[in-house]
């Protein structure tokens, strides 16, 4: 049956990267060859970082960091260090492994078929089931999440991301016992160094017991980021922030359903298994070769190496 609001949806949603609807804010026609050359040379000079020569990937990182070369370098450093030191999120990234398969069975992650007028892409996630699983499921959830956005960064150029997290099917025990300050701190640190600008986060269908988690979350992020976090009891409220063409049909938008977007992402993650196991998405920093910061005597609590790991400002 055709939805009543289909007449208001004037963009046909397609999931191919080349078909994404973009605007003048899009950077697709800009090669940024000089900046990419500088990044390749810089990576070659960094003893602890992998020697990346994938120009399209580096270009997407540069665009994601607002065309700032030094910001991109800082981001790449943190990006690869996180992957080396936070094993629960970035250990063996096998799409057919038990941990990732469990996450795929329980959760959908999808990427909007269209971009906003500003060139932002919407990431939507929803749990399929609230079943209990052995171990720390949120670590598996986070591993799968970063595999999905790594895959998307490899294929698509965007100016930033907006996240919609549908909490309609949430495991109360997981949320209240596994979302610890340490888990949030590591998650936020990883997101800080990811080569995407975080525009907004929308939590919808939020259960009342989740308030304690959001209080912890907000206490760990700068006020600037707090202003980008929204909680909605009514899912349709996201339509006040994001245009319909970028919102799944089951949330009142014109894009494909969360299930369709999630299944597409899942299929692609499995299809790119070699890239996750042995290709660019498996690469990490060699922390034994990381230069020490001679200007600092501080010890990083997160990364565990001498010297103060420079923290990015999220903007």
Language model features: what each stretch is:
Residues 1-315:
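Basic, amphipathic alpha-helical/coil surface patches used to engage anionic, phosphate-bearing ligands
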């Amino acid at each position: 049956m055709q939805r009543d609001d289909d007449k208001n949806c004037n963009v046909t949603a397609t999931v191919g990267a080349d078909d994404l609807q973009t605007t003048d804010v899009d950077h697709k026609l800009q090669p940024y060859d000089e900046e990419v050359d500088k990044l390749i040379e810089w990576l070659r000079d960094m003893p602890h970082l992998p020697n990346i020569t994938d120009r399209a990937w580096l270009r997407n990182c540069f665009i994601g960091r607002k065309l700032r070369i030094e910001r991109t370098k800082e981001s790449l450093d943190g990006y690869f260090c996180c992957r080396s030191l936070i094993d629960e999120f970035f250990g063996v990234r096998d799409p057919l492994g038990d941990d990732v398969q469990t996450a795929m069975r329980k959760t959908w992650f999808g990427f909007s078929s269209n971009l906003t007028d500003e060139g932002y892409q919407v990431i939507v996630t929803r749990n399929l089931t609230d079943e209990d699983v052995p171990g720390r499921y949120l670590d598996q959830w986070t591993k799968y999440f970063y595999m999905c956005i790594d895959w998307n960064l490899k294929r698509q150029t965007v100016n930033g991301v907006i996240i919609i997290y549908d909490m309609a099917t949430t495991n109360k025990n997981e949320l209240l016992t596994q979302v610890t300050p340490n888990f949030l701190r590591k998650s936020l640190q990883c997101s800080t160094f990811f080569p995407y600008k975080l525009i907004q986060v929308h939590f919808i269908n939020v259960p009342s017991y989740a308030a304690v988690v959001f209080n912890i979350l907000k206490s760990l992020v700068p006020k600037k980021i707090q202003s980008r976090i929204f909680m909605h009891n009514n899912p349709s409220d996201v339509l006040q922030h994001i245009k319909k063409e970028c919102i799944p049909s089951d949330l009142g938008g014109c894009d494909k359903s969360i299930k369709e977007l999630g299944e597409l992402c899942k299929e692609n993650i499995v299809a790119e298994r070699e890239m996750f196991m042995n290709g660019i998405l498996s690469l990490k920093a060699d922390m034994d070769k990381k230069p020490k910061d001679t200007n600092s005597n501080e010890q990083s609590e997160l990364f565990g190496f001498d010297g103060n790991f420079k923290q990015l400002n999220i903007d």
